[in-house]
Structures are given as C-alpha cells and as structure tokens.
C-alpha cells in the first residue's frame, strides 16, 4: 500500500510499504480522510519534543485525525465491525495500569499514540491498524469530512466543558485555529456568551458566523473580563495574559502548547481564587463529539479549507495552500487520491 513517510526534517514522501495485517484484538481500517494538524507540522520540521526525548524517531508515519471503514478484523474481534465507518482514539494505553483501568488511558505512561508516539503507524496511508477498543462507530449523518474532525473536536469539547460554558457565562477563546474555532462552536452550543481573539480576519469571520459575540484581531487588544478563558494558542505569553483577563473565582483552560516554556505568576492565581485546567487528548470526549456532530448542533465542515491527495502532503506540511482553498484553518488528505 501507499503511505506518507517522514524520513528526516523536511524530508518526506509517499512510499510503498507492506499492507498491515490485523493482530488479535485489532482491525485494519481503509482510511477515507486524514486531518493535518500542528503536531504533524512539528514532526515534519523536526521541532516536535518527542523527537528529542526518545518518544519518537524517524522514519515516521504521521496522521492521528482520521476516519474510514473497517476492512478486516483480527482474531477475537467481532465480524460485526466489518464494513463499519469508524474513527478512533489516538491514545492507546497499556490497558493494565491504574490510569488505564480508571478511564485515563490518554495519560498512561506506556501509551502508544497513533502517528505520534512509540512508532505506531499513522493514518496518512491507505490502511491503518487499530485496536478495536479504540474505535468509535460513525453514523451516516457524519460524512468523511466531519469524521476526520472528531479527534480535534474531542479536545475542543473538553476545553469548552472545562470552561464551565453555560447560559450567561462569559467565555473568551484565545486562538482561532481549528481547536479554537471548534471550542467556540461547543461553547456557543452550551449557551455561553463567547468572544474570540485571533490573528486572521478570515477565521474571526468564521467565529462570528458560529455565534461569537465579538471576534477581535489580537493586535487590537482585548477589552473586558471573563468568567472563563480558553487558551488555544501556541504562544508562550498567552497563559499569563489569559490569567489577567479572568474574573476572580473564574477558570482558565490551557489546551494550546508553545514550543518553549510559559510562565504564570501563581500568586495572582491564588489571590484571585482562579482554577486552571490543562487539557490533553480527545479521549474522554470523542463519543460526545459524535453526538454533537450527528445532531447538527455543531458542524465542523466549514473549518476545512481543502482536501488534497496523499502526494501533496509534504507541500501542505511545508505551509502551502491550494489556490482554491477556502478560509478555514484545516487541511484534509485523501489517502486514496492521487
């Protein structure tokens, strides 16, 4: 089969690799769509921290935001799964430690991460092996475009829930990339009064169309104070700035990751009785996202700028956008095209 393989910093291409065979407890999925995210870009450029702490090494097969159809099943897997449209969890815990047995496999110390950690091959390929325990079935009301956005949606839904979004609550989402815009949609769906700050007028316009009250360019400054602030940026200065914008007794939700450490004056947090929450992984919220997407309460598809063939993946990771791309921040790959 064909797979996209990164062999070194900014060195990558499509290769012919062996077809995966399902091991006991696994299925092999025929991949329909794959989302490209910032983690993939960091791996492609050689900046990802996992490359420097031993959690990942080249060659790499990327892709952890995906959907597809189960094409084969391994020993011990119910044949009911054959032909089912699915997406799946990125985080594959050991299944035995106290974190896994308490439902926190996404922070298992020995976890694999599909297309990210400890060599589990990613979805930027025609087929993908996945443990059946990681699968989530997709209803017909969720098409392939939306299906590839379940995983980032899980991160965003967790952020919105952690913010306490509800009618009358003032929520600021800082960042208008994929996660930020999805967080806007979920917070609005939960009834919150949502403002957004970001770098690009095109994505801020999308935020307004999703129901944000105000959407402001970051260089214009931020006015007001909020019950909750969601940091969905990769800017190391934003965590401290977010703390300065939250109401005493409020909440700050950190879901963005900067490439260098960020610093917060915890004295301000204590004296204002602020709760800070960190969000890692979509795992606990993926089924909830499926329900939101299936019902139409949240529609992620406007976020997709374009869908391109597998052969164009390297160009997308290098920052190229097709001339006919829409205004959204998300690029999708069709592994069977091109």
Task: Mark where each language-model region is.
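C-terminal hydrophobic helical "lid"/dimerization subdomain
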Residues: 1, 240, 283, 287-338
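Glycine-rich beta-strand-centered segment in the early N-terminal region that forms part
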Residues: 20-34, 49-98, 139-141
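Mid-domain Rossmann-like dinucleotide-binding core that forms the NAD(H)/NADP(H) cofactor-binding site
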Residues: 140-219
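Glycine-rich cofactor phosphate-binding loops and adjacent beta1-alpha1 units
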Residues: 163, 195, 201, 205-275
């Amino acid at each position: 089969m064909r797979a996209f393989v990164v062999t070194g910093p900014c060195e990558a291409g499509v290769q012919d690799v062996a077809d995966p065979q399902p091991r006991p407890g696994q299925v092999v999925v025929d991949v329909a769509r794959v989302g490209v995210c910032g983690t993939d870009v960091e791996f492609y450029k050689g900046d990802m921290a996992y490359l420097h702490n031993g959690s990942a090494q080249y060659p790499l097969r990327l892709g952890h935001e995906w959907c597809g159809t189960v094409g084969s099943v391994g020993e011990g897997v119910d044949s009911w799964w054959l032909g089912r449209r699915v997406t799946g969890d990125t985080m594959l815990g050991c299944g035995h430690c106290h974190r896994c047995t308490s439902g926190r496999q996404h922070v298992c110390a020995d976890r694999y991460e599909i297309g990210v950690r400890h060599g589990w091959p990613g979805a930027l390929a025609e087929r993908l092996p996945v443990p059946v325990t990681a699968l989530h079935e997709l209803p017909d009301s969720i098409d392939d475009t939306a299906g590839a956005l379940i995983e980032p949606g899980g991160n965003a839904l967790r952020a919105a829930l952690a913010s306490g979004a509800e009618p009358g609550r003032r929520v600021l989402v800082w960042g208008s990339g994929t996660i930020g815009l999805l967080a806007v949609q979920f917070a609005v769906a939960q009834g919150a009064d949502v403002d957004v700050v970001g770098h690009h007028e095109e994505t801020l316009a999308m935020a307004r169309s999703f129901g944000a009250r105000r959407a402001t360019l970051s260089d214009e400054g931020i006015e007001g104070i909020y019950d909750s602030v969601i940091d969905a940026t990769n800017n190391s200065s934003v965590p401290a700035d977010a703390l300065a914008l939250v109401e005493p007794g409020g909440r700050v939700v950190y879901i963005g990751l900067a490439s260098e450490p960020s610093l917060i004056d915890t004295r301000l947090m204590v004296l204002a009785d602020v709760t800070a929450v960190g969000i890692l992984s979509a795992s606990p919220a993926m089924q909830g996202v499926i329900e939101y997407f299936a019902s139409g309460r949240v529609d992620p598809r406007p976020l997709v700028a374009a869908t391109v063939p597998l052969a164009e993946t390297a160009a997308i990771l290098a920052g190229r956008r097709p001339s006919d791309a829409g205004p959204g921040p998300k690029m999708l790959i069709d592994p069977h095209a091109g």
